[in-house]
Amino acid sequence: MPIIKVRDNEPFDVALRRFKRSCEKAGILSEIRRREFYEKPTTERKRAKASAIKRLTKKLSRENLKRIRLY
C-alpha cells in the first residue's frame, strides 16, 4: 500500500492526487480489477496467450512499416 506524508501547508487535493498517482504506479487498481471476479486457470492462460499473440502481431506490423518507410 503506497504511503505518502502530507507536507506542511499542503492542500488536501494535492496530497490526494499524489496518493492516487502512487497507487497507479504501484498497479493497485489494475490488480483489484483483475481479481474482482474469479477466473479459471484455463481462461487466464487463454487470455495471456491471446495478449502475447496480439503483442507479437503488433510488433511485426511495426517492423514491417519501418521496412516499408525506408524505401
Swiss-Prot record:
It holds the Pfam family Ribosomal_S21. One of its GO terms (biological process) is translation. PANTHER family: MITOCHONDRIAL 28S RIBOSOMAL PROTEIN S21, SMALL RIBOSOMAL SUBUNIT PROTEIN BS21. One of its GO terms (molecular function) is structural constituent of ribosome. The keyword Manganese does not apply. This is Small ribosomal subunit protein bS21. One of its GO terms (cellular component) is ribonucleoprotein complex. The keyword 4Fe-4S does not apply.
